[in-house]
């Protein structure tokens, strides 16, 4: 866990197995923060991920103001991500479930590897050995349920808020979704202004 007054990352903070937790007044990321486990950021004032990338098995962000302009906040796990903020600026940003890149074509699925006769073209001799590997725990990790809860405003201009899990977006004041995309199972809006173009 990192605890500081201000945290600024323009490089790489990553972990292959452990949770990354940062507690600060302000957190600024223009680099990469990644883990296969949980990424938990708690800022008393602001999380600024403009042009930055956050990628984790589960994402849990809490701040008064969250800015993700041209940034990416991607969750690779199937659990619900959790974002709590007073305001969210997601102009040209992406928030949600990480997707596979299909820009090289419209191929779907996987291609089976060719199957060959193991004795054909084998150069193996009778001096082989067998090593027993230690067992690996393959139990999937479970995380807390989450939601995206914004107390005031969302500015999702040309941005994307996507998630294929059963997650709710709750907004109390206004949504500005101009040229943006919001794909979530549920949207609860109790505010004054909803602009969707």
Describe the function of each predicted region.
Residues 111-119:
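Polyanionic, low-complexity segments and short acidic motifs
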């Amino acid at each position: 866990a990192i605890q500081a007054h201000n945290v600024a990352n323009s490089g790489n903070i990553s972990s292959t197995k452990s949770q990354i937790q940062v507690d600060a007044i302000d957190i600024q990321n223009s680099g990469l923060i990644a883990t296969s486990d949980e990424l938990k950021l708690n800022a008393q004032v602001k999380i600024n991920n403009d042009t930055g990338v956050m990628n984790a098995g589960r994402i849990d962000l809490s701040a008064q103001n969250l800015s993700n302009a041209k940034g990416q906040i991607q969750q690779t796990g199937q659990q619900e991500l959790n974002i709590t903020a007073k305001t969210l600026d997601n102009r040209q940003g992406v928030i949600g479930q990480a997707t596979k890149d299909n820009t090289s074509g419209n191929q779907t699925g996987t291609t089976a590897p060719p199957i060959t006769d193991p004795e054909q073209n084998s150069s193996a001799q009778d001096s082989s050995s067998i090593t027993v590997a230690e067992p690996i725990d393959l139990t999937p990790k479970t995380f807390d349920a989450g939601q995206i809860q914004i107390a005031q405003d969302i500015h999702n201009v040309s941005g994307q808020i996507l998630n294929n899990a059963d997650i709710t977006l709750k907004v109390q004041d206004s949504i500005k979704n101009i040229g943006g995309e919001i794909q979530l199972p549920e949207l609860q809006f109790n505010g004054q202004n909803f602009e969707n173009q």
